[in-house]
Amino acid sequence: MENMEMNFRLCKNHLDHTFVDLGKTPLANSYLSKESDFEIEKEIPLKALVCQKCFLVQVDEYEKPEDIFNNYAYFSSYSTSWLEHTKKFVTEMIEKFNISNNDQIIEIASNDGYLLKNFKERNIPVLGIEPASNVAKIAEKSGIPTITSFFGTETAENII
């Protein structure tokens, strides 16, 4: 279904310039079970438009977050390069911003908590915010306090 009158969500400018159109694609990380009928796999259009006013890009259609993150298949800990990066990144951030145990690190979309784990190992209080409950449970089991929620105004107000 084509949206003929689309405005950019940020600046409200009319969008009519296609940046890239990749056709239809299955939802990321929404693997089908062996019993699933591949012919009914949900596909969504992957078309991005660029705003001629602010030059930011947005997709013309998107799925509800609840449909994407109800059982997320990707875990940060699967990537050895990510794990190595987080150790270096945390060391650099602690030094650059003089972070101590008097501070708190909050990560939005914290996945299984491996970035926060590096801060916690240095006795810096942490909090993860992760919408996918299956991934958030893994973070909690490894000792990373995690709020299972989408980050928005309500979640921010609850944290404060």
PLM segments and residue spans:
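Conserved class I S-adenosyl-L-methionine
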Residues: 101-111
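Conserved SAM-binding loop
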Residues: 139-140
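N-terminal juxtadomain amphipathic helix
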Residues: 2-81
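Conserved SAM-binding loop of SAM-dependent methyltransferases across substrates and taxa
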Residues: 112-124
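Conserved SAM-binding strand-loop segment of SAM-dependent methyltransferases
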Residues: 143-156
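Conserved SAM/SAH-binding beta-strand->alpha-helix loop
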Residues: 132-134
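Conserved alpha-helix/loop element of class I SAM-dependent methyltransferases that forms part
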Residues: 81-102
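Conserved SAM-binding motif I beta-strand of class I
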Residues: 125-130
